[in-house]
Amino acid sequence: MCSLIQMAVVCCAATFVMLPSSAGEITEANWPQFRGVDATGVSLNTGLPDHWSVTENVEWKSDIAGRGWGSPVVWGDNVFVATVVNTGETEPIRKGLYFGGDRKDIPQSVHEWNLLCLDLASGQILWEKTVRTGVPTQSIHLKNSYASETPVTDGEHVYVCFGNIGLYCFDFKGEQSWSHELAAHKTRNGWGTAASPVLHGDVLYYVNDNDDHSTLLALNKRTGEKLWEVDRDEKSNWATPFIWTHPDRTEIVTAGTRAVRSYDLQGNLLWSLKGMSSITIATPYVADGLLYVSSGYVLDPTKALYAIKPGATGDLTLQDGQSSNDFIVWSSKKIAPYNPGTIVNDGRLFVLYDRGFVSCFNSKTGDPLFEAQPLNRGSEFTASPWSYDGKLFCINEDGMCSVMKAGDTLEILHTNSLAEDDVTLSTPAIAGDRLLIRTDKRVYCIRNASR
């Protein structure tokens, strides 16, 4: 799941989209999916912390057995985290971008695929459920995990996916409602999986792009019954789809190998766009009425980013020399990041690159405001950035977070660090006035001590 230059396709993909709808009320106190309610990574909440350390402003921290790069999700007093425990020996994580992370052989030790529920106020584990015990069905990249998909919740149930294993539904008391088995498929170079399911209405959608048989799957969220499944041409990818609701319709936007495809809620193709890189990780999202889609595999010459208007039909592919058309407002073939998703704040689109540089563009025109400015020194970046209170937060794989002003120039305000043994590939979650950071060993709840 990482790239040929290998990093983790993982957490960033690890990922979700669009407001899950249910009897539960979606508020800024909840963070029901990857990158939040609207998948933008932006919170309008106030009172959130911008300073922390391994002790400062740490309300609690809880050790999590096993390994998983999926983000925490939050609803009410519940924090949900997926993990897989290897009863044998797990190879140490190697941070950064590199060759040599392929692991062709499937581990033969027994693993446990688990979903945990933690108490938001204390970090206490309220319940832990094992959905499978056995030998893995696939190999994964050294930097991937068997729990890189982020759960999604509608306030009544939580849905978790373990790629090549299955989709599972639990109520908030930990009782399993249903399961749907996923067949094991080959993935690119044996890197594994990471794309997360998404919710809309009473339907759970899952993109299963692999090297055998790629599909878009729709399940009844209450029963797990398959409603429909459509074949896709794309091969292995790790991008979570996005449910885009606008005045014209609701559609399912999927970013994939060299192409973007959007479907209606019955799986019929609405439009497509060629011109992505060969590996896609970032989840699409909408800001200020435009859809932003990016893919920037580091070994490909094309690192495309598109800003797209709603209402498109047919083939949106740009002709040679074009950077826009009737529905593509602007685009660039050279500016997309690889693992991290982009983020829009107050008319500015920020791009965090894996090697620790940041660029900023006018989100409505694509005009550059600043480009390739360096952040803190240290390891690479896999987690997607997040934003609140006029600030942008970028955390690297060492757990060092650069806090910067979200402005027209790069202004780094300060940096925050976690424990020396923490490895941070997961994108954090925001709930109320709390920031939840997952590392390879634990979950931190960061909150201003005065609150």
Predicted features by range, described:
Residues M1-L4:
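N-terminal secretory signal peptides that target proteins for export/translocation
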Residues S21-R451:
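Noncatalytic, solvent-exposed loop/strand surfaces
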Residues Q6-M18:
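Bacterial N-terminal signal peptides
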